[in-house]
């Protein structure tokens, strides 16, 4: 995606250079003095369109109907990573979260920037489907973050397991937390949780899984566990 004044340019590229084309229709949101949605009918590798105004950013595939990796221009990508949770429409927010994930996989977003985007936006998410999607993405990126940032990330995830407004999200976050927490303070919290079995949302299998995880992380207490 590229804009030049009031002109929008979209290019489609086959990453394997097979000359394939994917005709498709999808919505694009133009942000600026007044947000506007346009419909794109992509029938060739290049699409150009005159816009009604000069947008501050262009957000691709906001209706979720398109397929493939949508790569916004750099300013739009940075804005999305810092503000995706502010998008009011649930469908657009879910679709653009997927756009961010695909750009993370394509190495356009670093693991640390991606995890920071997720743990910043997730506490505000009220839609169960979007929250579940964000939590799943968080589980995928946990092992990739820099060791120096690990303890802080784990602490912020633990906070969400205690106070996120959606019970389903709290459970999902707790399960990923049990599988991924390695910092000493957070492992101690998991040990206390296993001892007291105080989280009534977790079932017997969850606590059995937690026992196995703790036995690996706390080898000196493994026999007791």
Language model features: what each stretch is:
Residues 1-225:
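Non-catalytic accessory/interaction domains
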């Amino acid at each position: 995606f590229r804009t030049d004044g009031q002109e929008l340019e979209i290019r489609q590229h086959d990453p394997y250079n097979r000359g394939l084309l994917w005709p498709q229709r999808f919505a694009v949101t133009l942000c600026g003095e007044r947000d506007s949605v346009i419909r794109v009918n992509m029938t060739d590798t290049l699409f150009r369109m005159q816009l009604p105004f000069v947008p501050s950013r262009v957000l691709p595939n906001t209706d979720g109907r398109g397929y493939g990796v949508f790569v916004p221009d750099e300013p739009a990508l940075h804005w999305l990573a810092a503000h995706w949770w502010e998008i009011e429409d649930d469908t657009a927010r879910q679709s653009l979260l997927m756009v961010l994930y695909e750009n993370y996989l394509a190495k356009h977003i670093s693991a640390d920037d991606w995890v920071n985007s997720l743990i910043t936006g997730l506490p505000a998410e009220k839609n169960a489907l979007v929250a579940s999607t964000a939590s799943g993405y968080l589980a995928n990126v946990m092992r990739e973050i820099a060791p120096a940032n690990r303890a802080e990330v784990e602490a912020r995830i633990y906070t969400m397991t205690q106070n996120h407004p959606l019970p389903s999200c709290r459970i999902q976050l707790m399960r990923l937390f049990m599988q991924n927490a390695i910092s000493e303070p957070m492992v101690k919290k998991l040990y206390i949780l296993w001892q007291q079995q105080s989280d009534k949302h977790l079932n017997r299998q969850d606590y059995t899984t937690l026992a196995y995880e703790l036995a690996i992380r706390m080898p000196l207490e493994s026999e007791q566990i």
